[in-house]
Amino acid sequence: MPPAPPDQKPCHLQPAPYRALSETILFGSLNEERWWHSTAPILSRLLISSNYDVDVQYKYLSLYRHLVLPALGPYPQRDPETGIIATQWRSGMVLTGLPIEFSNNVARALIRIGVDPVTADSGTAQDPFNTARPKGYLETAARLLPGVDLTRFYEFETELVITKEEEAVLQANPDLFKSPWKSQILTAMDLQKSGTVLVKAYFYPQPKSAVTGRSTEELLVNAIRKVDRESRFETQLANLERYMERRRRGLHVPVVTADKPPPTEADKTFDACSFFPHFLSTDLVEPGKSRVKFYASERHVNLKMVEDIWTFGGLRRDPDALKGLELLRHFWADIQMREGYYTMPRGFCELGKSSAGFEAPMMFHFHLDGSQSPFPDPQMYVCVFGMNSRKLVEGLTTFYRRLGWEDMASHYQGNFLANYPDEDFEKAAHLCAYVSFAYKDGGAYVTLYNHSFNPLGDVALAN
């Protein structure tokens, strides 16, 4: 049965829960206080516009204050010469390098908090790959939140995260890993309307690949099989492996031409095939109920490639897959998605840099859920960072109306604008980084991964 049209309510520039809590919070540091006022208003508006009960809004803002704020590390600084606003540690979660991102599953009107937990040592010689802090953050989350089980985290950490000895090798041999994207563990919390929280961990094994000489695909696939002792995921994983092998035999990176740039240092950490394994995520719940999502990226960004990946080269053609593909084509057209051959970015696009024209590959995740379906359900993520934010929101509004989501179509643009009162909406191209599309349970699912930070005071961007 298709999901009901999502809730969406208009929200105010200064949401009441944020204002009320701000009057009573004793912050642990100036960093925490500044992070709060730069990010919490956005989270509060998202919870209001998505129609969370008031008591649940206060619960999640309190959780944000006590768990997340201490994990965001030093507040960003503005370089007086360049005007660039950045943190010491550049997080691979966000193209601006910031360690926080709110995402909005508009189909279910659910909000997610993405966090790259850091300390003042992250990115320094003391902790060049930010290896230690994410574990401590998740262990704190497990003490605070019922139902969090870290078994899967510890298992994947052992397989995919560098050891102290491997870290020393990478430090002594900097040419082994020259990519600016160094995050190994990211985290997320799905904020359910009921007040329960689903915690997830994401593992990026590129540093491990560089120091061991094993490919990203080998590390990811072997890790999944090692933790999947009951072979719940085997059929779906084997079909995904066969598709990746078919792609390796066929579509390789084309000869470089004027419009196909050479590989960046980040590109060199991945497979040369345009479709390359990237990372995985897992639910931090009881292992028998935990799902795994396998993420891969695609440098050829066009509808023909989307259709090939969506159908596993034409093998996945059940009615839901074909209906989803039909809607995906409308989605692509409505947002006027750009097409081309896009390498991994050379570096981050920190605040203060021009984001117009910034490009990156698209991504897909493949949902290994242990169901009877022989193919894992795909979800597409297109990078819209660098595209005009106003035109993107207008395109999304068109798509919402196509789906019959009238509440969302009526209020989405106004609510989006309220989060960025100091931005020039006509020129901004960084307010949304990715948009994802999936089709399940007879309906479309769209999630927005939005800019989640407004700088304060002397750090604010000059007009």
UniProtKB/Swiss-Prot annotation:
Required for regioselectivity, annotated site positions = 114
Record has Ligase as a keyword: no
Q: Tell me which residues bind dimethylallyl diphosphate.
A: 112, 200, 202, 293, 295, 379, 381, 445, 449
Where exactly are the transmembrane stretches of this chain?
A: none
Q: Does the keyword Transferase apply?
A: yes
Example GO biological process: alkaloid metabolic process
- Catalysed reaction per UniProt? brevianamide F + dimethylallyl diphosphate = tryprostatin B + diphosphate
- According to its UniProt record, the EC number is 2.5.1.106
Q: In which pathway does it act?
A: Mycotoxin biosynthesis
Q: Which residues bind brevianamide F?
A: 93, 101, 204
Task: Please name the GO terms that the record assigns under molecular function.
Answer: prenyltransferase activity
Record's keyword terms, sorted: Alkaloid metabolism, Prenyltransferase, Transferase
- Entry-linked NCBIfam families: arom_pren_DMATS (TIGR03429)
Q: What does this protein do?
A: Brevianamide F prenyltransferase; part of the gene cluster that mediates the biosynthesis of fumitremorgins, indole alkaloids that carry not only intriguing chemical structures, but also interesting biological and pharmacological activities. The biosynthesis of fumitremorgin-type alkaloids begins by condensation of the two amino acids L-tryptophan and L-proline to brevianamide F, catalyzed by the non-ribosomal peptide synthetase ftmPS/ftmA.
**Family the UniProt entry places it in:** Belongs to the tryptophan dimethylallyltransferase family.
Fetch the PANTHER family from UniProt: INDOLE PRENYLTRANSFERASE TDIB-RELATED, PRENYLTRANSFERASE ASQH2-RELATED
Q: What is this protein called?
A: Tryprostatin B synthase
Organism equals: Neosartorya fischeri (strain ATCC 1020 / DSM 3700 / CBS 544.65 / FGSC A1164 / JCM 1740 / NRRL 181 / WB 181)
Organism classification:
Eukaryota, Fungi, Dikarya, Ascomycota, Pezizomycotina
Name the encoding gene, please.
ftmPT1
